Amino acid sequence: MTERKRNLRPVRDVAPPTLQFRTVHGYRRAFRIAGSGPAILLIHGIGDNSTTWNGVHAKLAQRFTVIAPDLLGHGQSDKPRADYSVAAYANGMRDLLSVLDIERVTIVGHSLGGGVAMQFAYQFPQLVDRLILVSAGGVTKDVNIVFRLASLPMGSEAMALLRLPLVLPAVQIAGRIVGKAIGTTSLGHDLPNVLRILDDLPEPTASAAFGRTLRAVVDWRGQMVTMLDRCYLTEAIPVQIIWGTKDVVLPVRHAHMAHAAMPGSQLEIFEGSGHFPFHDDPARFIDIVERFMDTTEPAEYDQAALRALLRRGGGEATVTGSADTRVAVLNAIGSNERSAT
């Protein structure tokens, strides 16, 4: 990765992000957009929507064009019976950017959105300036057991119960009570965000889309689609990894494994943060993103170099870090439970 002296772009007063819609392949795609300059695409996680970025969107838009979409099946985008795999989501992001006439982008992905961001970089490297992974899914199969259980048939039935009168309010009240009791623990840290996401699930098409999305990436054993076998392909792309130490959805060791598997990547750990570090410390998150944008050159797509890299492959020589981390990465790459796209 090429670093450069920090290039400070002018800060402008800009209008707040506006909610807009485009129809792509017959489906309505919602997104929030603000600012001008180099483009940043913010991709949210499963069950979430573009408003999750509200604390950082407007500030970043003072220096960049910032687009935060609602993924298909989420927020105010349509929720059809469709393909909700990470590859399909990456295709959808490519198509939305094309409709918006945006040729290249720095892609920021949180949770499931991190997996989508990695898949986007894998499928469309010619469109990627930089890659920022925030508590990203798809590093190894490990994921919180709640998601494993929710991927089972009984999980869909449990989500259907949320549509019954008074069930969701009761769950939210119970959650707040539990949150007060465990608020200082890792589990309690992210509970408000979990309750916020639950607000959307009683709507039938939203809960169905959530279930399809979850089952596309998780089963009872954990995450089915992992990125470690292809991380070496980011060799020519500037990569920033951000994670919280109290993340109970995707443990912070995933950050160190991804960092070890991505040559030249940068790593920032938010001490005391949970699964949403950009909520816990938005000012620090903004500073990291801006500094990363300012001190790295956009990736230069070289088809011949990519072809040579693919032929050479990854393996032990491309993994860095401590001995324990390297062993963990290589063991995960060699696992027969891994499924690549």
UniProtKB/Swiss-Prot annotation:
Keyword Hydrolase attributed: yes
GO CC terms, sorted: plasma membrane
Record-annotated active site: 111, 247, 275
Swiss-Prot/TrEMBL keywords: Hydrolase
UniProt superkingdom: Bacteria
InterPro entries the UniProt entry points to: AB_hydrolase_1, AB_hydrolase_fold, AB_hydrolase_sf, Epox_hydrolase-like
Family annotation (PANTHER family): HYDROLASE, PUTATIVE (AFU_ORTHOLOGUE AFUA_2G14860)-RELATED (PTHR43798:SF33), MONOACYLGLYCEROL LIPASE (PTHR43798)
Further comment found in the protein's record: Was identified as a high-confidence drug target.
Designated name of the protein: Uncharacterized protein Rv2715
